[in-house]
Amino acid sequence: GVYNTYGYYFGKIHVDPSNSQKIYTYGVPILTSDDGGKTFYRIGKENVHADHHDLWINPDKPGHLINGNDGGVNITYDDGKNWIKNNSTEVGQFYAINVDYQKPYNVYGGLQDNGVWMGPHNSLVNKRWNMTGQYPWKGILGGDGMEVQIDNRNPNIVFTGYQFGFYSRLDLGSGKRKSIKPSHELGQSPFRFNWQTPILLSPHNQDVLYLGSNFLHKSINQGDDWENISEDLTNGGKKGNVPYGTITTISESPIKEGVLYVGSDDGMIHVTKNGGKTWNNISGNLPQDLWVSNVYASNHNEKVVYLSLDGYRWDNFSPYLFQSKNYGKTWVSISSNLPDSPINVVIEDNVNQDILYIGNDHGVYISFDQGKTWEPFKKGLTSAAVHDLVIQEEEQHLLVGTHGRSIYLADIALIQNHDIDNLLADIKIFDVKDVRFSERWGTKRSTDINYFTPSLKFSIFSKSSHKASFEIINNDKDVLFSQSISLDKGYNFIDYNLTILDDADIDLND
């Protein structure tokens, strides 16, 4: 064989269109042959990621290749002797994200075959780091990066890992790392860990850590020791090349310690109200045998819990989303007008209990009435599968982790202050911030720099999409500025640079 490892589902073979003796083959490595396949050699270099998915061969210029791999895109003009890594498009495939509460706060995320990264939320996308050598984001673990939990007492203590439950406790201050994966006892069957093993720090005690295999494991010392606090919470394993019959999601009520929900890849949902002493199966009146993509205990009501199921593995793309108001004893569908697309995550707003957010395979949707109706919430968001959502409560930011287009951020302060009056009014204009005059307005330091102009952002809620006239009027009813605008249904944001009409009848010296 040519490979020393598997080609997997992405293994392919190409023949150079300008040279029948030139062959390229790739899967985990990328290889080439100059003699029709008699001998092969590697052409991947240190800045070329493994797991190669596609290759373009320039038919008019031998040796010019464009390679798509798990690290993005690489380009060579000399048949792989040297490669350029193309970082101009954000294509990170995040499985899970999280935030801390430093100032400025950091965002963390686990990426498909690109490890776990962290960086400041306010870092701008630009190429300045190529000059300074100081890239604002940094990798903190390798492998297929998975879920991340941060100790809210000491943000240097981070719990994260890679596929199939290989989690560690990291001390970012000292650089120390300790493996914390639970192990079965001698004579027991090995635990089954999902590819994306769920992990959760208790919101009530940051020394308490939960981790799911086919059992729920609990540690009271941040992963140094573990105890099983459940029986097998799945329907049992199945033979295959990856473990099946595994826990996929864990949630603890932030209101009541010990109220825990667990979901599995074979459609099982369980609840305990006493920290694992007893468990109840609460999946009875739900669609059966689907993947439990997310379970979410309410921030506002101890009895309320939300649940999403995913059926795409069985060619079922229906949106399965449910709410329970009695610890999962009975469930009500709240998918209402959501489109046919698998739902990967559901969360509740931390300020307004009526507001829910979901991420599906095409974007983000928002409900202002606990799921009775849904609206797209994706202006400025590239169409991509959304795998995780998290709210940074102090800054009132919604972070969106996509599996294909990296991470997005939205300011949700206005949304969190949403009330029924906004929905009833045709148009509502929210209060604007005061603007302080500056002598710099209308000036610039040199001819190659734009004029310094002030800016004022207006936030407008519209009941429908339509054309409107936007006017700025002073206390004397003088029209200072007028412009035709298009309002979308929902929230709109208009930047106004404080210019006034040439024929405005005002005295600028007043």
What are these regions, as identified by a protein language model?
Residues 187, 446-448, 484:
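Outer-membrane beta-barrel proteins
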Residues 168-170, 456-481:
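Beta-strand-rich binding/interaction modules
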Residues 430-433, 463, 473, 486-488, ...:
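A structural detector for beta-sheet-dominated domains
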Residues 441-466, 493:
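Contiguous beta-strand segments within globular domains
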Residues 18-20, 255, 465, 501-504:
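Extracellular acidic loop/turn motifs
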Residues 479-510:
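Glycine-centered tight-turn motifs at strand-turn-strand junctions
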Residues 1-444, 453-454:
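Beta-propeller blade termini and top-face loops
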Residues 201, 460-462, 498:
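Hydrophobic beta-strand positions in extracellular immunoglobulin-like domains
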